[in-house]
Design a protein with these regions (language model features):
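A structural signal for beta-strand and strand-to-loop patches characteristic of beta-rich domains
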Residues: 1-255
Length: 255
């Protein structure tokens, strides 16, 4: 726009258009749920611009998804988000297979949202068939440390598949393994070292019915004791156009 002194002033902004009033995000404290072991689930309600929804109320349902798509309800909880927009609950699965946490929440304005989060359970005992992907790799943790043993769950829609796995993005003999799935799953263990920091790639492929199926995963291994925290502090909170300013740049280490 142009004001009375013919000076031009311009501005811009952003508008977020969404098809639902808020979103529901569900995460587990592990990459897959070990059968018979307690697992922690975190449920967050937030708008598209990241604002958390406090005091949203509803239910969360644990379901076992059968191979034909049927969902068997195992347990139901009443939940409510706190001031931080988060709710949590603990549960455990009794058998291997595909499961879902289906959450329904309603905010203070009467807006209701439903969301379903699927995950795998793995353990000894009965192996229930499932259908999810031709080939997948599921790390057991979000982050690792040198000396940890990563337990990678390799899964396939094809029973008893034979899968080549490659660790550390290498074709060396010690990195290459041929894994035979027990029905639809196999657990691959890999001990991590300092040389694997800050991340390590894992790749796998299998051939079925003349088609090549590939999967990959990244293991995060933060370099403990080597992280730096940079910060920039301006000399003052506001400056006038053309005014000379100064900033302080600081880097802190773990000590």
């Amino acid at each position: 726009m142009t004001d009375a002194s013919l000076r031009e002033v311009s501005a811009s902004g952003q508008v977020i258009a969404t098809f639902r009033p808020f979103n529901i995000f569900t995460t587990l404290n592990c990459g897959y749920a070990p059968a018979g072991t307690p697992v922690r689930a975190s449920i967050t309600a937030a708008t598209a611009d990241g604002a958390k929804i406090a005091h949203a109320r509803g239910t969360c349902v644990l379901q076992h998804i059968r191979a034909d798509g049927r969902r068997e309800t195992l347990e139901t909880w009443d939940i409510a988000t706190g001031k931080d927009g988060e709710a949590s609950l603990s549960f455990q699965t009794g058998e291997s297979g595909l499961y879902a946490l289906s959450t329904t929440l309603e905010d203070g304005h009467g807006n209701k949202v439903e969301e379903s989060f699927q995950f795998l359970s793995y353990g000894k005992g009965k192996q229930n068939p499932f259908k999810i992907n031709p080939l997948s790799i599921h790390p057991d943790k979000k982050e690792y440390a040198p000396g940890d043993t990563a337990r990678l769950l390799v899964t396939s829609d094809y029973p008893d598949a034979r899968v080549w796995t490659f660790l550390r993005n290498s074709w060396k003999n010690e990195s290459r393994r041929l894994v035979s799935l027990d029905r639809q799953t196999a657990l691959v263990e890999c001990r991590l070292t300092r040389e694997d920091m800050p991340n390590m790639g894992v790749n796998a492929f299998t051939v079925r019915n003349g088609e090549l199926h590939e999967a990959s995963a990244e293991l995060l291994i933060p370099p403990a004791g080597q992280l730096l925290a940079p910060s920039i502090v301006p000399g003052k909170s506001q400056y006038r156009p053309g005014e000379q300013g100064n900033v302080t740049f600081q880097v802190k280490g773990p000590d």
